[in-house]
Regions:
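C-terminal and inter-domain tail/linker signature
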Residues: 1-130
Length: 130
């Protein structure tokens, strides 16, 4: 992966999540990374959310189905596996803004995900929550 390859950057982030190598993802994010879904600044909150998620759903993993790159934006549609079954294949759609070869901002929505997942990743006591 080159520092300027946004698609490889997002795929590497998913690899770190799926292999539970959360600390290896630190260098993928800018220090002021902002997560719109969590309402937090800094990747520490994201790592906490990842750890909480896999504690509750140990087999949770994401598989990139579509990746679209437009300048400094990467949109990724991922299928979600390892969670309690629902009527539809769960999907996660995320958009990332890349700055200086690192993830700087994220937006995301899920479809067909159990409500438990949303509750386990939201942390109201996060000091970096806005």
């Amino acid at each position: 992966m080159t520092a300027r390859d946004p698609e490889a950057l997002v795929r590497r982030m998913q690899e770190c999540f799926n292999t539970r190598q959360f600390d290896q993802a630190d260098d993928l994010f800018t220090p002021d990374f902002f997560s719109h879904p969590l309402g937090t600044t800094g990747f520490a909150a994201g790592k906490r959310a990842w750890r909480t998620l896999v504690t509750h759903f140990p087999d949770y993993r994401v598989v990139a189905e579509d990746v679209l790159v437009d300048h400094d934006r990467v949109a990724i549609r991922s299928s979600v596996h390892g969670i309690p079954p629902t009527d539809a294949q769960p999907v996660l759609i995320e958009i990332f803004r890349v700055a200086d070869g690192r993830l700087a901002e994220a937006w995301g929505v899920g479809q067909g995900l159990p409500h438990d997942i949303l509750r386990t990743t939201a942390s109201s006591d996060d000091p970096h929550r806005h």
